[in-house]
Amino acid sequence: MAISAEELEKILKKSFPSSVIKITDLVGDQDHYALEISDAQFNGLSLINQHKLVKNALSEILNKKLHSISIKTISIP
């Protein structure tokens, strides 16, 4: 149950192609990540809805290849 940061970014880029993504492997096991993603899709959305977009993009791997993820979303013009 692990996924590389590169694979994680590829999955996110499918839903957020113009985003700026920063991924940090928190403990070096490819299973616990901190994610910072900046995208115009977040403009006008509540924080909860921004996080829902990210979680929907990751739905194929959540609870399968990813144990823990901390999400920080940033809306950009």
Curated annotation (Swiss-Prot):
Q: Which InterPro entries does the record cross-reference, listed alphabetically?
A: BolA, BolA-like_sf
What is any Pfam family matched here? Answer: BolA
SUPFAM superfamilies, A to Z: BolA-like
- The name under which this protein is listed is Uncharacterized protein RP812
The scientific name of the source species is: Rickettsia prowazekii (strain Madrid E)
